[in-house]
C-alpha cells in the first residue's frame, strides 16, 4: 500500500521514549478494532489511516514529535467522523487496555 506522504517521523511513547513513527501500526490498530466488531476490512483501515496522516500533517509541523495519545485521539476522531461508531468503541477499549 502506498500511504499518504507523512511529515511526522517520530512519536513520543507513554514512557517518554522517542520511537520511529509507523503508519502501518495505525492501520493495523484500526483493522483490529474493525475485526473486533466483525467488520474486518484492511483496505478501509489503510484509507482511514491515510486520513489520520492528513490530519497529523495539518495539526503538527514537521519537526514536531506528537505523543502516542495525540495520535490515538485523531484515530478516534476519524472513526467517528466516518460514522464507524462500533469500530470507534472497540478502538477506545483497545486503547484503554494498552494504557494499563
Task: Describe every region a protein language model picked out.
Residues 1-100:
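Long, C-terminal-biased catalytic regions of enzyme "large/alpha" subunits
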Amino acid at each position: 500500500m502506498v500511504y499518504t506522504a507523512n511529515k511526522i517521523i517520530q512519536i513520543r511513547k507513554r514512557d517518554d521514549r522517542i520511537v520511529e513513527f509507523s503508519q502501518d501500526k495505525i492501520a493495523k490498530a484500526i483493522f483490529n478494532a474493525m475485526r473486533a466488531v466483525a467488520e474486518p476490512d484492511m483496505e478501509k483501515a489503510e484509507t482511514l489511516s491515510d486520513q489520520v496522516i492528513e490530519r497529523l500533517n495539518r495539526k503538527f509541523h514537521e519537526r514536531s514529535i506528537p505523543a502516542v495519545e495525540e495520535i490515538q485521539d485523531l484515530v478516534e476522531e476519524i472513526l467517528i467522523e466516518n460514522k464507524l461508531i462500533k469500530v470507534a468503541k472497540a478502538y477506545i477499549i483497545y486503547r484503554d487496555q494498552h494504557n494499563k
